[in-house]
Amino acid sequence: MTVAPQSQTPLTGEDISRRVLKLIGSLKSNADLTVEHLEQQTGLSMRRAADGGSFGTGAAIDSNWSYNLLVGPVLGEKKNQLTFDFDRTGDQNAPMTPVCALDFDDYARALKDMGFQDSAVRAEHNRISYWNFQGPVSLRVYVEGESNESPEKIAHSCVKTITVE
């Protein structure tokens, strides 16, 4: 589902990150992934897809970045999945700096303060593929280095995508 940008004052990466963390903290179960609950917790208007089973919102942050917040059914299951992501819409090599004011460490600290337990899921060469956070709902958090400008920026983990079930 592609969501048309909302016509309002653009949110910053930090603004939308704080709203998503507030939303995650409010979820008691997968049943809370409803239009009404997301609108109440994020302050954003959701749009329903033509099929009626999916909904979401999204908007530009700047000329290179946008965010998407989408909910849809999990195939073969009676539950929904929320996907939040920062999407490069301009320069495909743009640094994540505009969407990394709250970095992975900030997200992880906030999620742990909410009672979530974390574990890294590793891929080949012991590289972290994503982070699992278990609580009232299950999260997968995918990260990316802030930029290729320096070893420090490469190692600085920014949140790229979060899925919630």
Ranges and model annotations:
Residues 65-130:
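Long, charged/polar, surface-exposed segments that mediate recognition or autoinhibition
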